[in-house]
């Protein structure tokens, strides 16, 4: 009986965690992160520190997204590749 109860508790915890967690890419190399509470979007946005038109991308969990033609803003797991 204790085993059944423990199994139910573990399954409940896992299901609750999976239902509320968004996973986003946070690096070009493919590292991922479970987003903190309140961060319900994944984003990939272009950053330009160069004066010749070159840019690089930043990947993150966010609550609001940057505007831009090269940017990706989405709300499903691993959508910001």
From Swiss-Prot:
UniProt superkingdom: Eukaryota
Tissues where the protein occurs: Expressed by the venom gland.
InterPro entries documented for this protein: Snake_toxin-like_sf
Protein name: Mipartoxin-2
Signal peptide: 1-21
Record's function text: Snake venom neurotoxin that blocks neuromuscular transmission, presenting a postsynaptic action through the nicotinic acetylcholine receptor (nAChR). Has no cytotoxic activity.
Organism in which the protein naturally occurs: Micrurus mipartitus (Red-tailed coral snake)
Family membership noted in the UniProt record: Belongs to the three-finger toxin family. Short-chain subfamily.
GO cellular component: extracellular region
């Amino acid at each position: 009986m204790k085993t059944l109860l423990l199994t139910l508790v573990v399954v409940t915890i896992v299901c609750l965690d999976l239902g509320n967690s968004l996973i986003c890419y946070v690096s070009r190399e493919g590292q991922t992160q479970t987003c903190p509470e309140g961060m319900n979007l994944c984003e990939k946005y272009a950053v330009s520190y160069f004066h010749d038109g070159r840019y690089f991308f930043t990947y993150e969990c966010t609550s609001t997204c940057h505007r831009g033609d090269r940017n990706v803003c989405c709300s499903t797991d691993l959508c910001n590749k």
